[in-house]
Amino acid sequence: MKYQQLENLESGWKWKYLVKKHREGELITRYVEASAAQEAVNLLLALENEPVRVNVWIDRHMNPALLNRMRQTIRARRKRHFNAEHQHTRKKSIDLEFMVWQRLAGLAQRRGKTLSETIVQLIEDAEHKEKYATQMTTLKQDLQALLGKK
């Protein structure tokens, strides 16, 4: 396992995940009967500040079809949590207009690169172009100075 599991923190994430799914109208309990399902949901809502008991609730009441998706969500959240601790692994976001993003995505796809790799490549290309332009300007000035002296 690459990332350490923190039971209290992850139980809080699980609680939030389940409450969000319930509010979106998804069935989060294993019960078909509405009253039993509502009773289990009310019990879950009461466990907001008791993270250890959330895991017990999950074992007893959660819809088994939701288990795999919840695990994937928690795994992704754990990864983001630990990556955010280090500057070099922290994800950044930038605002792009849709047309800009579309062109960038198309270029990345043609080059077979990720968006980040494509942006780095574009920056490097611009830097090389700038360096080349500076060298050409210097060369022109030197050439004019040589021709002007004669």
UniProtKB/Swiss-Prot annotation:
Specify the superkingdom.
Bacteria
Alphabetically list the UniProt keywords: Cell cycle, Cell division, Cytoplasm, DNA-binding
Tell me where in or outside the cell this protein is found.
Cytoplasm
Q: Which GO terms describe its biological process?
A: cell division; regulation of DNA-templated transcription
Q: Which Pfam family would be a valid example here?
A: MatP_C
Chief location bin: cytoplasm
Cited InterPro entries: Arc_rbn_hlx_hlx, MatP, MatP_C, MatP_N, MatP_N_sf
List the GO terms this entry assigns under cellular component, sorted alphabetically: cytoplasm
Recorded GO molecular functions are: sequence-specific DNA binding
| Family per similarity comment | Belongs to the MatP family.
- Function of the protein: Required for spatial organization of the terminus region of the chromosome (Ter macrodomain) during the cell cycle. Prevents early segregation of duplicated Ter macrodomains during cell division. Binds specifically to matS, which is a 13 bp signature motif repeated within the Ter macrodomain.
Q: Which HAMAP family match?
A: MatP
What does the annotation say about its assembly with partners? Answer: Homodimer.
Indicate what this protein is called per its UniProt record.
Answer: Macrodomain Ter protein
Q: Which gene encodes it?
A: matP
